[in-house]
Amino acid sequence: MAAKDVRFSSDARDRMLRGIDILNNAVKVTLGPKGRNVVIEKSFGAPRITKDGVTVAKEIELSDKFENLGAQLIREVASKQNDAAGDGTTTATILAASIVREGTKAVAAGLNPMDLKRGIDIAVAAVVADLKANSKKVTSNEEIAQVGTISANGDKSVGEMISTAMQKVGNEGVITVEEAKSLETELDVVEGMQFDRGYLSPYFITNAEKMIAELEDPFILVHEKKLSSLQALLPVLEAVVQSGKPLVIIAEDVEGEALATLVVNKLRGGLKVAAVKAPGFGDRRKAMLEDIAILTSGTLISEEIGIKLENVTLQMLGRAKRIRIDKESTTIIDGAGAKGEIEARIAQIKSQIAETTSDYDREKMQERLAKLAGGVAVIRVGGASEVEVKEKKDRVDDALNATRAAVEEGVLPGGGVALLRAIKALEGLTVENADQKTGVDIVRKAIQTPARQIVDNSGGDGAVVVGKLIENPSYAYGYNAQTDEYGDLVKLGIIDPTKVVRTALQDAASVGGLLITTEAIIAEQPKKDSPAMPGGGGMGGMGGMDF
């Protein structure tokens, strides 16, 4: 076991504080509309340029073990904030650094760390209650666009694109961000249910130019097992032929005699048909087939529930307005499923999402939810260079997370003003002793730092601006760093999601409070390099030799 180095009390806290300050100084420059970029060296490829706080924080590794411990703990705040709200990582870092800095001073002055932490917790609870009380629900697409614009550093096109995507796929829909190969940033919306399985045979194609199979108003057979025998399939095929409608078969697989017969019928024009493999694997495949059956008002044909293929009637088949199948994906548009049944299925998936502990399962269930609820939107981020695309993608990701958070918990005035206004909530707090009161004061000072930093980054004097804002009693009155003007921030469209502001303070206070109560740090001692081997001397007795 390697030897350890142990530091105590103020020495320990001071060493950690140095590391925290280094990380905080690198992250805080990115805050606000006039925040600066940070360039990060990569082990291969071009350097990365970003304004994303958590990306900067994750890259910082310090040579001094004790300083690095402090930096890692604050990095944890940024990561936790990113997981909880997906935005506000810089704000969380700044708040945590302020709480630790002021708390360390108080402990050095002889105050009780545990009482300080209790005071911090009481103050944070009061601020959170104030934020929730003043939160305003997002009601319009314009407000969604404003939140996205602020998070994307004033890029209006990004805010509007996210607002359009949410409008089209709904709040439950999936919106993903990808890198584009072109210069333009585009929005691609897939309405209806799409899954990543294409046609089983190119002979099913109806549009040779586009290489797709399009079937209008088809019947849909949803089968759990493989289909290889023709005999069991014949009664359904005959019933569909008599109806004059097309047929789409979604099954684990269609092969052999069954596939050959379907292809022959399609080529002869006797039956418009297409066969597709079922999406997913194992239990997830069964769940997705049930989703398709509910969406199309059909029945999942499964021997488990006593339905044999030869007994299937037209009433058991699903219906949809149109189905579009290409080589790699199938899209069901306007399924005939009853709204009540689809909503019940959505509620069931939501409760499963709440119960699961696996991130992978949660992600897959959210995909299923989106497909049932509305659709999928893809924002393809373009740019002139790879570096520019990556930087813009970071901002679009942040903006997307911020808009989701805004829809979830509402919005507050931006620019750090909501936290500033919460100072009033700390005025009447009752605490047990003077040390706890100092804990409340630590939070009072910390919640002013984001607004100060935004002003500092835009070239103004943070202390002067914050003083002006506190003097004005209007809740939404604030400073627009982009235009260097004062006014009603909500009317100016400068708003922050309540969830982002709330979790930033809670995460910062959680780690900051623990750091204040630290009394010892244990870290590995740096390894001493062993001395190098001495150089070999010349061999003796070799003189007088000619070469």
Curated annotation (Swiss-Prot):
- Domain of life of the organism encoding this protein: Bacteria
EC nos: 5.6.1.7
Q: Which GO terms describe its biological process?
A: protein refolding
Identify the stretch(es) annotated as Disordered.
527-547
Reactions that this protein is recorded to catalyse: ATP + H2O + a folded polypeptide = ADP + phosphate + an unfolded polypeptide
Q: Where is the composition biased (Gly residues)?
A: 534-547
Residues bound to ATP are T30, L31, G32, P33, K51, D87, G88, T89, T90, T91, G415, D496
A single cellular component GO annotation: cytoplasm
Subcellular localization: Cytoplasm
Per UniProt, the keywords (alphabetical) are: ATP-binding, Chaperone, Cytoplasm, Isomerase, Nucleotide-binding
Is the Cytoplasm keyword given for this protein?
yes
> Is Transferase given among the entry's keywords?
no
Q: What GO molecular function terms would the record report?
A: ATP binding; ATP-dependent protein folding chaperone; isomerase activity; unfolded protein binding
Record text on subunit structure and interactions = Forms a cylinder of 14 subunits composed of two heptameric rings stacked back-to-back. Interacts with the co-chaperonin GroES.
Query: What is this protein's function?
Result: Together with its co-chaperonin GroES, plays an essential role in assisting protein folding. The GroEL-GroES system forms a nano-cage that allows encapsulation of the non-native substrate proteins and provides a physical environment optimized to promote and accelerate protein folding.
Cross-referenced HAMAP family: CH60
Q: Which family does it belong to?
A: Belongs to the chaperonin (HSP60) family.
**Any idea what this protein is called?**
Chaperonin GroEL
